[in-house]
Amino acid sequence: MGKNTKRNKKTKQQQQQPQQNGVTASASGTAVEDFEDQQAASSLPSLNGKKRSQLNKLVEELLDLVEKQPANPNEEWKQYGQLQELLKQIMILEEPLSQAVCPQISDSPDDQTRLAKVEAFSAWAKDGGVHSEGLEIAIFPGYQLGLRATRPLAKDELVLSVPRKLILSEENNSDCRLFGKMTQATHLNLAYDLVIEKIRGEFSEWRPYIDVLPAKYNTVLYFTTKQMELLRGTAAAALAMRQCRVIAKQYAFLYKYAHTMTEPSTGNRSHPGERGLFFTQHGLCYKLYRWAVSTVMTRQNLVPSEKQESEDGPKLISALIPYWDMANHRPGKITSFYATVSRQLECTAQEAVNTGEQFFIYYGDRSNTDLLVHNGFVDPNNTKDYVNIRVGLSLTDALAAKRASILDKLNIRHTAELRVLPAPDFISKELLAFVRVFKMSAEQLDHWCSDLDRAGDLLHIDCALETDHETRTWQFLEDRLKLLLAVFNKEMHEADEVKELELKDGQEIELMLFLYRRLERSILAGALQYAQEHRKV
């Protein structure tokens, strides 16, 4: 693996020295790494006792807040506002530390700053075994950094490969694992490892890669309350606020464990997790954790674990793949795969690319809601887009058990989020079947329950049903879609607002949110017209 200059120099010197045995070499290397750990930690500012005490109190309040599950959208919005206020106070107290580990970038785009470090990163990647002949990193308006073709690339041509040793996953820093036997999502393990490497600064072997990562993101973790308010009433609102709640809770757990549940760590490598605890105690702050989680959310890919097994083979774990993750998204097909035999990620061109054009990859089938919340962008040409509608059986419905038996046969949950689709389908078969079951009379339920093997017919648009039943089904869908669209009708001057925003700098998030609203409204409006036409028929 390519390493920074200091680490390379150190390694060469060690190789040149005669060694009497492996133990001596190992002890020497450990001593150097221990010294580097201490150097990295000592370079960071420490908070005084008063600020630490205030932070401890705020983190306890934060944990108490996020433990409460909001009962409805209004409560969820109120909780989000309280959460943002607490995080604001926490970030003010942590500011000296934040400036050290996540230095503020000026209002000008940070891509020029990153581009200045691209040369060092490209050399590091090449030394580490990345093969990217025909590609280079460049600035593209509207994308920041991306990959540019330096020669014509043929469709299906292998254009990029990244070896396992240059793929950052939770298995790289297992000695830093803070959580012991606690089960944690793989992407959060990776985010924690990235926190550690960021704190290690110049002593991290991943420094050239970290230096070219964005300084901030357009993910929901960076939204202001005013920006989040633009999502209220949309399908993305609950998911976005839930994401903020989960990450705040995880940060608070890490903070509490490091500062109120354990003694100060010396970073003793002989004790599992001590190095991680050591760096967490010295460098963890919310801005750093938010950055690390956003980095993972926007750039991760899954690779097979080399240490963990599942019932179906190697467990899939989250990973950051340097150089490959510079490629931006365009609709198409997935052309990136991990080759187990050669232990590398391989990427082919999904289309022919001319010299000087941007090289794109396809991130996979995701709705714009998912792209917005987890990737920080939306795709106006997304053919796989959809809008979720939450539906559920009533607990007070005397016929709920019969409805449930039909839904069980259809593998549809009794309370579920089901899809409204773009043209030409509009209503997913699962949503249509659910509403058909939901609007059945007692007699109709008896008829369908008497032969559950026929339940699959309810998934088809041309299923033979009584006219009054179909009318009730489409009327329900029409009414529900009108309610969902009502939230957009409140914004009568949205087009004017977009034009005004386009004339200002630094409005990327607002423009993205208005685009998302327009795309969701378009799907719902198309489905409403479709439902109205079917009701009339």
Swiss-Prot record:
<dbReference type="InterPro" id="IPR050600">
    <property type="entry name" value="SETD3_SETD6_MTase"/>
</dbReference>
<dbReference type="GO" id="GO:0046975">
    <property type="term" value="F:histone H3K36 methyltransferase activity"/>
</dbReference>
<keyword id="KW-0009">Actin-binding</keyword>
<dbReference type="InterPro" id="IPR046341">
    <property type="entry name" value="SET_dom_sf"/>
</dbReference>
<dbReference type="InterPro" id="IPR001214">
    <property type="entry name" value="SET_dom"/>
</dbReference>
<dbReference type="GO" id="GO:0018064">
    <property type="term" value="F:protein-L-histidine N-tele-methyltransferase activity"/>
</dbReference>
<feature type="domain" description="SET">
    <location>
        <begin position="133"/>
        <end position="364"/>
    </location>
</feature>
<feature type="compositionally biased region" description="Basic residues">
    <location>
        <begin position="1"/>
        <end position="12"/>
    </location>
</feature>
<protein>
    <recommendedName>
        <fullName>Actin-histidine N-methyltransferase</fullName>
        <ecNumber>2.1.1.85</ecNumber>
    </recommendedName>
</protein>
<dbReference type="GO" id="GO:0003713">
    <property type="term" value="F:transcription coactivator activity"/>
</dbReference>
<dbReference type="Pfam" id="PF09273">
    <property type="entry name" value="Rubis-subs-bind"/>
</dbReference>
<keyword id="KW-0539">Nucleus</keyword>
<dbReference type="GO" id="GO:0005634">
    <property type="term" value="C:nucleus"/>
</dbReference>
<dbReference type="GO" id="GO:0042800">
    <property type="term" value="F:histone H3K4 methyltransferase activity"/>
</dbReference>
<feature type="binding site">
    <location>
        <position position="299"/>
    </location>
    <ligand>
        <name>S-adenosyl-L-methionine</name>
    </ligand>
</feature>
<comment type="function">
    <text>Protein-histidine N-methyltransferase that specifically mediates 3-methylhistidine (tele-methylhistidine) methylation of actin at 'His-74'.</text>
</comment>
<keyword id="KW-0949">S-adenosyl-L-methionine</keyword>
<dbReference type="GO" id="GO:0018021">
    <property type="term" value="P:peptidyl-histidine methylation"/>
</dbReference>
<dbReference type="GO" id="GO:0005737">
    <property type="term" value="C:cytoplasm"/>
</dbReference>
<dbReference type="GO" id="GO:0003779">
    <property type="term" value="F:actin binding"/>
</dbReference>
<dbReference type="GO" id="GO:0030047">
    <property type="term" value="P:actin modification"/>
</dbReference>
<keyword id="KW-0808">Transferase</keyword>
<feature type="region of interest" description="Disordered">
    <location>
        <begin position="1"/>
        <end position="50"/>
    </location>
</feature>
<dbReference type="InterPro" id="IPR036464">
    <property type="entry name" value="Rubisco_LSMT_subst-bd_sf"/>
</dbReference>
<dbReference type="InterPro" id="IPR044428">
    <property type="entry name" value="SETD3_SET"/>
</dbReference>
<dbReference type="InterPro" id="IPR015353">
    <property type="entry name" value="Rubisco_LSMT_subst-bd"/>
</dbReference>
<feature type="binding site">
    <location>
        <begin position="325"/>
        <end position="329"/>
    </location>
    <ligand>
        <name>S-adenosyl-L-methionine</name>
    </ligand>
</feature>
<keyword id="KW-0489">Methyltransferase</keyword>
<feature type="binding site">
    <location>
        <begin position="143"/>
        <end position="145"/>
    </location>
    <ligand>
        <name>S-adenosyl-L-methionine</name>
    </ligand>
</feature>
<comment type="similarity">
    <text>Belongs to the class V-like SAM-binding methyltransferase superfamily. SETD3 actin-histidine methyltransferase family.</text>
</comment>
<dbReference type="GO" id="GO:0045944">
    <property type="term" value="P:positive regulation of transcription by RNA polymerase II"/>
</dbReference>
<feature type="binding site">
    <location>
        <begin position="375"/>
        <end position="377"/>
    </location>
    <ligand>
        <name>S-adenosyl-L-methionine</name>
    </ligand>
</feature>
<dbReference type="InterPro" id="IPR025785">
    <property type="entry name" value="SETD3"/>
</dbReference>
<keyword id="KW-0963">Cytoplasm</keyword>
<feature type="binding site">
    <location>
        <position position="114"/>
    </location>
    <ligand>
        <name>S-adenosyl-L-methionine</name>
    </ligand>
</feature>
